[in-house]
Amino acid sequence: MIDRLASGHFEVRAEIDGVPLMVMIDTGATTTVLSFEDARRAGYEPETLRFEIPIMTANGQASAARVVADEIRIGDIVRRRVPMMVAQSGRLERTLLGMNFIGTLSGFDMRGERLVLRD
């Protein structure tokens, strides 16, 4: 179970390619998008990526680059070969866990101030 933050969002510890990161669950995001800083932490060398894909973020329009996670893990839930994007530096404060991951689950439920992910 994931508790709702005071901000109203749900954030959870995920491991992306074995690197622990805090991600915000975003059912409005089509794709999982790494912040530039989290991409660096996860070993994607964002300075070498080509930011050619236009995306909309809470901060407005930005460009992103495509990458693929070998593995994303949230607790016992594991998905492999997950397509993701990396946002340009300074354009995304928090990595977003999008519907390309959430949609692979058998479901998710809101229970009061908690979110439950079901594999």
Predicted regions and their residues:
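Pepsin/retropepsin-fold aspartyl endopeptidases
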Residues: 1-22, 27-119
